[in-house]
Amino acid sequence: MSRFLICSFALVLLYPAGIDMYLVGLPRIAADLNASEAQLHIAFSVYLAGMAAAMLFAGKVADRSGRKPVAIPGAALFIIASVFCSLAETSTLFLAGRFLQGLGAGCCYVVAFAILRDTLDDRRRAKVLSLLNGITCIIPVLAPVLGHLIMLKFPWQSLFWAMAMMGIAVLMLSLFILKETRPAAPAASDKPRENSESLLNRFFLSRVVITTLSVSVILTFVNTSPVLLMEIMGFERGEYATIMALTAGVSMTVSFSTPFALGIFKPRTLMITSQVLFLAAGITLAVSPSHAVSLFGITLICAGFSVGFGVAMSQALGPFSLRAGVASSTLGIAQVCGSSLWIWLAAVVGIGAWNMLIGILIACSIVSLLLIMFVAPGRPVAAHEEIHHHA
């Protein structure tokens, strides 16, 4: 079992590493490519677009051909794209490389969740996804630090060579450690069950909405945090970095505590707790009389996301024993596109950073609480329906 956990964690971590590691080198990249930093900030959106594009096909291919045939090309593409970015001499080529990086990371991301669905029952999967969420929270803190240390002695291109090395590690794991987990093609008697795993299932759709809104909350916070903390609240850059590190610490602590909480409380209780924390955060930020209270509200956001997201993702994947790849892709596409659409629309309409965050917090909590209360899960997957990996 440990081989699947290690491989899944490695496959997922390419995604945040590809986002955060290069940011520290952005000024030098812009100078060398004769582009403004503002022009290169679109590299974040281009990377997410590549991930979304990969998710359109990766899940279906993973369900038909297997997890390894998607993970291996995905890791290889991430390596090639990282090298391509390091060799880019224009901003156009650099952005093209970032898109290809997103394609590779998206393939690996989809496969990771499909593997966890294949190999873990509902309760263990919820615990592992909570742990994975905690580990993912470490990357935005550690990746820029690692990038800074690399750039003390090496040029910015070395950041992408470091990413390529990460991709090589994932490729080696996928080639030599990971075993295929896709279930065998269903027999004729299993066809009705395969057909019953519909993406239009009310319970699955409710979890798609909940996880998409939750991701929208956390990405809105990350996207608006420089404005909120430095421009509105007046913190210096060093203080901003410290606050963000502390919020990551809160996220990690809660994420690593959630598996223990699942041994005491029902998953539904933790999901309700998550949304109540979001609602409390929105109200706190709306009526906050001081910076200290506002910072407390921000910690509630991090705690709320960490306590509920892994559980919601596990519930979303639960009904899909034969179509885990497609379900994982659907979740990823909805989360990436939904959160990006909200941030874009809010910017177009002219909603300020503070109100943007408060609005999504309150909307997420109200909608999600209603869905949790009134959309019950279908029958649990029986033990004989659990998918076992190939020997």
Swiss-Prot record:
The chain crosses the membrane at residues 4-24, 42-62, 69-89, 93-113, 131-151, 158-178, 203-222, 245-265, 269-289, 293-313, 331-351, 356-376. It is found in: Cell inner membrane. Keywords: Antibiotic resistance, Cell inner membrane, Cell membrane, Membrane, Transmembrane, Transmembrane helix, Transport. Residues 25-41, 90-92, 152-157, 223-244, 290-292, 352-355 are periplasmic. Its main location: membrane. The keyword Transcription regulation does not apply. One of its GO terms (cellular component) is plasma membrane. GO terms for biological process: response to antibiotic; xenobiotic detoxification by transmembrane export across the plasma membrane. Residues 1-3, 63-68, 114-130, 179-202, 266-268, 314-330, 377-391 are cytoplasmic. InterPro entries: MFS, MFS_dom, MFS_Efflux_Transporters, MFS_trans_sf, Multidrug-R_MdtL. It comes from the Bacteria. GO terms for molecular function: transmembrane transporter activity. It is a multi-pass membrane protein. The keyword Cell inner membrane applies. PROSITE patterns: MFS. Confers resistance to chloramphenicol. PANTHER family: CHLORAMPHENICOL EFFLUX PUMP RV0191, PURINE EFFLUX PUMP PBUE. Belongs to the major facilitator superfamily. DHA1 family. MdtL (TC 2.A.1.2.22) subfamily. This is Multidrug resistance protein MdtL. It comes from Escherichia coli (strain K12).
